[in-house]
Amino acid sequence: IDRIELVNDSGEPADNLTNDVRPEFRVTVPEDVNRVRLSLDGGRKWVDATKASAGVWGYAWPSDVTEGAHVLTVEATDIAGNTVMRTLDFTIDTTLSTPTIELDGPDDTGVQSDNLTNRPQPTFILKHVDADAASVVVSVKHGGTTTTFAATNGAGGWRFTPASDWADGAYTLSVTVTDKAGNVSHSVPLTVNVDTHVTIDSIVLVNDSGVIGDNLTNEVRPHFRVTVPGDVNVVRLSLNDGKTWVNATQSAAGDWEYIWPDDVTEGKHTLTVEATDIAGNKATQMLEFTIDTTLSTPTIRLDTVDDSGVPGDNITNEKMPGFTINGIDADASQVMVVVTHNGKSEELTLTQVSGRWHFTPDSDWTDGNYTLTVKVEDKAGNMSQSSPLTVTVDTQTVINSIVLVNDSGIVGDNMTNNVHPHFRVTVPEDVNVVRLSIDGGTTWGNATQSAVKGIWNYNWPTDVGDGKYTLMVEAIDAAGNKATQTLEFIVD
């Protein structure tokens, strides 16, 4: 017998391994052979081969042969009656396990088994790969393109790790195993998502009470809103450089919010925000903010030089009096003076000049009472106002009448025979000084106010000689206004 061949050998050529349960054999013998028969049970039962051509005989098993190793016995007989036998060992293998592929546990960086990873070169574990596997191939589909890679079998079993970094995105992997018999098996596809980074889009101090975006608030319980990508599942905040953390809550709108439950101290603070996505990526961002809840109470006073009456009585004879404003903090963003006069109020915005806060009306004020209040707002939105200051503008006074009381002639002729003339001066009630002179103002004598306000009397203390005189009377009111009037009289 020259040769025995397993025609449907499905593995490596001539390895006598097939996945066909009906093996087919070809026997090559000399041309004078006239009978070829085959047996799979050691010669107990024989089947006759069919001559295909001179010296070539064939036989395909008509019924299924069991899985496993077999010994084929071939017997050839020539026309002279010579008989020869030869055997062939062959194996039938029709089974192959279905492989599986899974993301390696340490590289499944999100929730376990969610097939999310932040590793650009993740490792995959291949299981249920039979020992007789001749080829193990991993197909990777990404962005519409499929690429195949050979898996490796090491001490830890079959594994696959990409040779270069994968870009972020979805990857679908499937395993194809071919055994030595040519059986092929495919895994169920596995889709993994590579997500290697996350961002924090914005951090907003919601109760920013100053200029929007200046991160200044007068709230001791600051409220923060954090905007992040939709795959973020944890947002936490810290005010002490990460020593302690609090978890934000996701709102219905998708933003993450947190209102500090305890009072935060006055001053500057650094908020640290950490966002973690479902792949386990982390992003950190900081926000500087300031809590300012205090604002000094301003004061307003009439300038000393314009307080023309008794110091501190807030009466002035200036039509455009000046006012000094104190207690204005350096972080004041708006300073206003509210002036109320005759039931009408006007708000006037002030600016600091040469480091000084001062207010002077732009035009003359008419006589009367004016109530001034200073309102201050700082950059944090705190507000404070002064106690009201009421000033009286009084720019004029008059002398109503001068009477020679001891007029001894015709009433009103201002002639007297008394060398101690007695004068009565009638003035407004706010006059607080009345003085008299008969020497052109060289010397003065102060009149005395009577029990009736506005009536002042003066008796000349020394003898006045006979003759004509000009009495000069000067009245000064509480605002410092002066009025002068003369009276001609005769002592005879």
Residue positions per predicted region:
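Flexible, low-complexity linkers/stalks enriched in Thr/Pro that connect modular domains
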Residues: 2-9, 86-104, 179, 188-208, ...
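Short, solvent-exposed loop/linker segments at the N-terminal edge
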Residues: 11-21, 109-120, 210-220, 308-319, ...
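Aromatic/hydrophobic beta-strand junction motif of beta-rich domains
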Residues: 23-29, 122-128, 222-228, 323-327, ...
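Short strand-edge motifs at loop-to-beta-strand transitions and within beta-strands
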Residues: 55-59, 156-160, 254-258, 355-359, ...
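Surface-exposed, short loops/turns at beta-strand junctions within beta-sandwich domains
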Residues: 61-69, 162-170, 260-268, 361-369, ...
